[in-house]
Amino acid sequence: ADDQDPTLSVGGILKAIGGNIRVGDSELFVAEACEYTNSFLHLFPKLAIILNIDADHLDFFKDLQDIRNSFRKFAELLPEDGVLVINQQIPNVEEITDGLACKVVTFGTDPSADYSAADIAHDEVGDSSFDVMHDGQKMGRMALSVTGEHNVLNALSAIAAADILGIPFVSMQKGLKEFRGTNRRFEYKGTKNGFTIIDDYAHHPTEIRATLTAAENYPHKEVWCIFQPHTYTRTKALFDEFVDALSTTDHVILADIYAARETDTLGVSSEQIAEALKKKGCDAYYLPSFEKIEEFVLERCQKGDVLITMGARSEER
């Protein structure tokens, strides 16, 4: 936007550039960081955005408080003339922000945030739009080409950062309207027998809930979710949260856990998640192979349904 020419290094494949790395010709360097193994503590940003803080990577961190402590250390890396843009909806956000040397700017759906969203709406294909409010004053209307309240929050954080950098609002409108997401983030894959197939990388309960909530704004009769949990550690530690998040949709199909870097020593399984969902009255199934899952959905999914394949996924998926 606004003829900026940043260098980019992000985790997902950006559809706009067909990759996750871009070498620009300006002083702007935009990097997507991760807290796993405290890798983000090796960065020294001038402007940083914290979107959320959740219990994750519990094979490395002891608990949520341990994760929050790392985010506090990350925030402390910002210099006095730096800016931290942070989601106001993070619980006890002051624990992260109080006493920092840098300036703190908040965003969220509550009007008390420095940058907030009002009158959120969704069009016939689920794409979001909202009024951007800054310190109680309307900056303008923002229309996105992606769906879900989580993307409204993502956009707000980008708007705050762009405003701090002096980028005009009209350029933000153009840039965010042209942004069509990344691969494996509510990615439309096509149709089969009249039902729509969406693929999503969500493998944490918070991400799952956000994706399934976004699906409710997408045209559909019923939503089917195929979920493959990622790592035994995460599945064991967040078992109840997975059940709660998955219970928000119409039908759930569980594939075997993708072990990734781990071995099965914790006695947790996808079948247990399916049984827990059934006890909550949910329509849930565990199927032991992707071949059986394919047969099942081709038999059950109807015209007008939406099928979401979800998870970090294994090689054979």
Regions found by a protein language model. Name each.
Residues 82, 250, 305:
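Glycine-centered, small-residue-biased loops immediately flanking beta-strands
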Residues 4-16:
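Short beta-strand-centered segment that lines the nucleotide-binding/catalytic pocket of NTP-utilizing
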Residues 182, 206, 212-280, 289:
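Active-site beta-alpha connecting loops in nucleotide-dependent enzymes
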Residues 27-36, 197-203:
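Switch II (G3) loop of P-loop NTPases
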Residues 45-197, 220, 271-275, 282:
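Acidic, Mg2+-coordinating active-site environments of NTP-dependent enzymes
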Residues 22-25:
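Conserved motor-coupling elements within RecA-like helicase/translocase cores
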Residues 316-317:
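Conserved small/polar residues in nucleotide/adenosyl-binding loops
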Residues 8, 48, 86, 106, ...:
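Structural beta-sheet core signal
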